[in-house]
Regions:
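Viral virion structural and adsorption modules
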Residues: 2-5, 35, 39, 175
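A composition-driven surface/loop motif
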Residues: 15, 37-40, 64-66
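Structural signature of tandem-repeat unit edges
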Residues: 23-35, 49-62, 72-85, 95-108, ...
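Consensus positions within tandem repeat domains that build extended binding/scaffold surfaces
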Residues: 44, 64-67, 87-92, 110-115, ...
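Short loop/helix-cap segments at secondary-structure boundaries that form the rim of catalytic
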Residues: 158-161, 175
Length: 175
């Protein structure tokens, strides 16, 4: 069993409290009350600790703008089924990020969300997605991707790397 090596609480604007802990197997877990339904992580965690796996608790519904950008040591992100939105540049520049689960229920992936995550080579897009904004997966290692949608959704300009092969279901409707 993993041992907690660091932990803390952050009081957010409006008085909500969010807790976090880091275990000796390099896992950061964030949980607790969230302001505006969006996790906002203070610079204290970023500057003090190194971890490879980020786990967000089931209470998280959105990840805010630039929350985890340029966290070079993150290799894996586990998102809860409650997540609905990953906002602009949430994981921008996480160059060692290799694995992200996008659970059923997620609806929006903001612009530049995973841009610059050059180690990210595969991603499974759930059919609950309604919007993927510009450059969401640009400058990643994704070479091919299958989209599950039979109905058109919003996909922004250059949301995948330039040479990405996109597979579309045969029964998909034209926009």
């Amino acid at each position: 069993m993993a041992k907690i090596i660091d932990k803390g609480q952050i009081t957010l604007q409006g008085g909500a409290v969010m807790s976090w802990n880091i275990t000796d197997d390099e896992v950061l877990t964030i949980s607790g009350a969230l302001w505006n339904g969006s996790v906002t992580v203070g610079k204290d965690i970023k500057s003090e600790a190194k971890f490879r796996h980020l786990v967000l608790d089931v209470s998280v519904q959105a990840i805010g703008i630039f929350n985890f950008s340029d966290w070079d040591y993150i290799e894996e992100v586990t998102l809860p089924s409650s997540i609905k939105c990953i906002e602009h540049a949430a994981f921008f520049g996480c160059k060692n990020l290799k694995r992200v689960n996008l659970p059923d229920g997620i609806e929006i992936i903001g612009a530049d969300s995973f841009c610059g995550c050059e180690s990210l080579e595969t991603i499974i897009l759930p059919d609950t997605l309604k919007e993927i904004y510009e450059y969401a997966f640009y400058e990643t290692g994704i070479a091919e991707i299958s989209v599950p949608w039979k109905e058109p959704i919003y996909i922004g300009d250059e949301c995948f790397p330039e040479d990405t092969v996109v597979y579309i279901p045969k029964e998909a409707h034209r926009a």
